[in-house]
Amino acid sequence: MAVIDPTRTWQMIEQRLETTSNPRHRQVLSIVLEHMIAEAAPDLDRLMATVSADAVYHFWGNEGDSGPKGHDGVREYYAAFVASKANHLEYKMDRLVVDDHALVTEGDLHMLLPGATAQQMGFPVDDPAADYLYVSRQLIVWPVNEDGLITAEDSYTSGPLEFRKLDRAELPQAYLDRVHA
C-alpha cells in the first residue's frame, strides 16, 4: 500500500471551502489550494501563477532562514524542487486557520525522496538507487496579497521525525512512473 497520497494534502482546504462563505477567506483558501495542486502536478508555470512578483519565502530551521527571495528566486527554487522529483508529498494537516491576510496550516509533512536526492540533502543514505520517506512537523504561514497571490511561504519545521528506506510496494504509482520510468 502506498505510504502517501498527495491528494490528501489539500483535503482540509477543500473541506473548509465547503463551509466558508466569506469571499476574502475563500480567495485565500483557493489560491493556496491551486498552489498545492500545481506543485503536486508538477506544473511550474501553473505553480508560479499563484505567487506574487515580490514574493519572499522564509524556511525556518536550526540554520536560520533558507527560503528563496523574489519571484525569480522562488521560480528557481521550484524548478529545482520539481527536477529533484521530491514533489511527491502528503501534508497531513491537523490545523488550518484563515483570515483576510493569510492561511496558517500545521501538520506532518511526508515526502518521498529518491535516494540520490536525499543524499544531496545530507541524509544518511545507504543506497542512492532506493527511495526514502522523510517526515517532519511543519507550520506554514501563507500570506496572500490584495490581488489574491501568495507573497510568502513561511515554514517552521521540526527537522526529521522519521527518515527510512521504503519498499517498492510502499510507493504510489505516480511516483514510480515519474521517478523510475
Predicted features and spans:
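Short, low-complexity N-terminal intrinsically disordered segments enriched in polar/charged residues
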Residues: 1-49, 53
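A beta-strand edge to alpha-helix "cap/lid" segment located at domain peripheries
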Residues: 1-23, 82-88, 92-181
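Residue-level detector of alpha-helix boundaries and kinks
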Residues: 20, 32, 59, 63, ...
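A solvent-exposed, acidic/Ser-Thr-rich amphipathic alpha-helical stretch
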Residues: 26-27, 44-116
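Alpha-helical packing segments of well-folded alpha/beta enzyme cores
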Residues: 31, 35, 77, 138-140
